[in-house]
C-alpha cells in the first residue's frame, strides 16, 4: 500500500508539471493571437520569459528563504543535540548529505525544508516544534522534510512558483499591449482583420482574451494542487524512512491541536511549511489551499 501511494503520487506530479508547462505555452499562444494575430510569436515570448525566470528562481540561494523566515543556523551539535542527531540519522537513511539545520524562534510548532538539490538542502524547525514533540514524533516530521529534499520537491515547487509568476507577467504584458495598441490605432487594424476573417476571428480573439485574463487564477490553482500532492508524497516517503507511521500521525495531531499561528510568516513561503502556518481547519482542500487538511493526511497514514 505504501509503495503504491508513492508511485501514484509521483505519476500525478508528472501529469501536473506537464500540464503546467503546456498551460504556459497556451497562454503565450493566446497572447500571440491577441497582440500580433500570430500564436507563434506568443509561444516564443512565453518560452523565453519562462526559461529566464525559472533559471533565476532555481539559482536563488536557500539562505534567502531562511532569512525571509527569520531562521538561525545551528552550526554545531551542542546547540541542539536532539535535532542535530535526528536530521543526521534521517538523512543517512534517505541516502542524502546531511542538510544544514536551522531553528525559527516561534512558539507555533512547524517545520520546512529548502534547497534545489540534496547537496544544497536545509531543514528548519520552530522552537515550538522542538518543545512540543517527543523524539519519535520529531523523527516523523524531519523524515517528511528530508523526503521533500530527496524527492526534489523544492525544485518542483520553485518551478511551479516561477511558472505562476511568468503567467502573471504575460497576462499583465498582454493587457498593457492591448491598451497601448488601442491608443495607437491597433484597434482599427484589428477591426480590419476581423472584417476580413469574419465572425470566427472575433470569437477566437474574445476566447483568447478571456483565457489570458483567467490564466493567473487557473495557474495558482494548479500550483496549489501540486503542493498538496507533494505533501501526501512526503508523508508516505517519511513512513518509508522511519517505518513508523504513528510518529508522524501523533505529530500531525499535536500540531493540529495547537491553535497558535506563526507570528511572522513570509507569504511566499507558506506552501513550504510542514503544515499551514495559518492554521486552516478545513476538512476538505480548497482550490487555493497549499496544504491538504491534516485530517486527510492522518487518514492516509492510518491506511498504510
Swiss-Prot record:
Region of interest called Disordered, as start-end residue ranges on this chain: 275-304
Subcellular location: Cell membrane
Keyword Ubl conjugation included in the entry's annotation: no
Pfam families hit by this protein: Peptidase_M48 (PF01435)
Keyword Metal-binding: yes
Topology in membrane: Multi-pass membrane protein
InterPro entries: HtpX_protease, Pept_M48_protease_HtpX, Peptidase_M48
Entry's Gene Ontology BP terms: proteolysis
Top-level enzyme category: hydrolase
TM spans (from-to): 14-34, 39-59, 159-179, 202-222
Cofactor(s) demanded: Zn(2+)
UniProt cross-references to PANTHER family, sorted A to Z: PROTEASE HTPX
Annotated family: Belongs to the peptidase M48B family.
Protein name, entry field: Protease HtpX homolog
Gene, per the UniProt record: htpX
Amino acid at each position: 500500500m505504501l509503495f503504491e501511494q508513492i508511485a501514484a503520487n509521483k505519476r500525478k506530479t508528472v501529469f501536473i508539471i506537464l500540464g503546467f508547462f503546456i498551460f504556459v505555452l497556451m497562454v503565450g499562444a493566446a497572447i500571440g493571437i491577441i497582440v500580433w494575430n500570430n500564436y507563434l510569436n506568443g509561444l516564443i515570448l512565453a518560452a523565453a520569459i519562462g526559461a529566464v525566470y525559472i533559471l533565476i528562481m532555481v539559482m536563488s540561494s536557500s539562505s534567502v528563504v531562511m532569512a525571509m523566515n527569520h531562521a538561525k543556523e545551528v552550526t554545531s551539535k551542542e546547540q541542539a543535540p536532539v535535532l542535530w542527531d535526528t536530521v543526521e540519522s534521517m538523512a543517512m537513511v534517505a541516502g542524502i548529505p546531511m542538510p544544514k539545520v536551522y531553528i525559527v524562534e516561534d512558539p507555533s510548532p512547524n517545520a520546512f525544508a529548502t534547497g534545489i538539490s540534496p547537496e544544497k538542502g536545509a531543514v528548519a524547525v520552530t522552537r515550538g516544534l522542538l518543545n512540543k514533540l517527543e523524539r519519535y514524533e520529531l523523527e516523523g516530521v524531519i523524515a517528511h522534510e528530508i523526503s521533500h529534499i530527496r524527492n526534489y520537491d523544492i525544485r518542483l515547487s520553485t518551478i511551479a512558483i516561477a511558472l505562476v509568476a511568468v503567467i502573471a507577467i504575460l497576462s499583465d504584458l498582454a493587457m498593457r499591449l492591448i491598451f497601448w495598441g488601442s491608443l495607437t490605432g491597433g484597434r482599427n487594424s484589428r477591426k480590419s482583420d476581423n472584417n476580413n476573417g469574419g465572425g470566427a476571428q472575433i470569437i477566437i480573439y474574445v476566447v483568447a482574451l478571456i483565457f489570458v485574463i483567467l490564466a493567473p487564477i487557473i495557474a495558482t490553482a494548479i500550483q496549489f494542487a501540486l503542493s498538496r500532492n507533494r505533501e501526501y508524497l512526503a508523508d508516505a516517503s517519511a513512513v518509508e524512512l522511519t517505518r513508523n507511521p504513528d510518529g508522524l500521525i501523533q505529530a500531525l495531531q499535536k500540531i493540529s491541536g495547537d491553535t497558535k499561528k506563526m507570528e511572522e510568516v513570509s507569504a511566499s513561503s507558506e506552501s513550504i511549511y510542514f503544515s499551514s502556518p495559518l492554521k486552516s481547519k478545513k476538512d476538505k482542500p480548497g482550490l487555493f489551499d497549499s496544504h491538504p487538511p491534516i485530517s486527510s493526511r492522518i487518514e492516509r497514514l492510518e491506511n498504510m
